[in-house]
Amino acid sequence: MAFKRSSLTVCFVSLAAGFLLGPTARAEGKISIAQQFGIGYLILDVVRDQQLIEKHGKAQGLDIKVDWNSISGATAMNEALLTGALDVVSAGVPPMLTIWDRTRGKQNVKAIASLGSMPNYLLTNNPDVKTLKDFTDKDRIAVPAAGVGFQSRTLQLETAKVFGNDQYKKFDDISVSLPHPDATAALIAGKSEINAHFSSPPFQYQALQSPNVHKVLSSYDVLGGPATFNVLYTTEKFHDENPKTYQAFYDALVEAQSIIKADKPAAAQTYIRVEQSKLPLALVEKIVTDPEIDFTVVPQRTYIYAEKLHELGVLKNKADSWKDYFFEQAHADAGS
């Protein structure tokens, strides 16, 4: 089992090769998966640690080779998926909806499963910023993928609510693309132009330990309650041509969900071990057991993004329900 924590340079070299070679056909028994940074990917950490894909593959008489990669940002993820450099990628709900929208009738990208519902906090070290209306052109908001990622799209939804639909991009110009670990360090240090960060677990909790950092907004405020943060998604080609591998992967996710819920302290240890995290175990346990967080494969409130982003003109295609952009294996659950 291979695990590569790719730098962006390596990532884009790989993408360039992908464009030259075209999409790669993969036989049953192989799957390449990419995740981003943070405890939002704990289900995948458990899958990897327990070798659950391999386990469920063997149950179907299949020896599956799993290739793990780590990339920051939805843009790089989506490019890697469409070039065939990766089979399965992970990102927030809005980036998944964007690629679903753009590939309808072509690669037909859809979501596989949720990776859990958890809040994302908009944080700042600027004492003058209490609400969204307090941000000025002098502020800089760090996000993993400016304008297009989960955090940016969530900010756009709230901006549209506060300032009107025609102003939904109001804060795009002061948004800066930066991986969560770097943005967290910058916010805590308080010595760079970055004075705000639309963060995610565990980074937001780490930042809030600093007395100079406070919360402005939660994604749960925007969406009206618990909502899916990250999802896994793939192309129709991979889904249809690799039914056993796909099913083994889906079954592995479901088992990982159960493992986490059965023993959350052990899951916290898994996160630290697999991610090689330097966070204190007590902090990770606090996050994993937070009642706001639910590690579930069932999608929650994803349709709010689909509906609003279509209304704003970001999505050309209108989904009738969440099932339009999830593969059928997820349809048995009471999602939204």
Regions found by a protein language model. Give the residues of each.
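Bacterial N-terminal signal peptides that target proteins for export
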Residues: M1-F12
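Conserved C-terminal helix/tail region of periplasmic/extracytoplasmic solute-binding proteins
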Residues: L309-S336
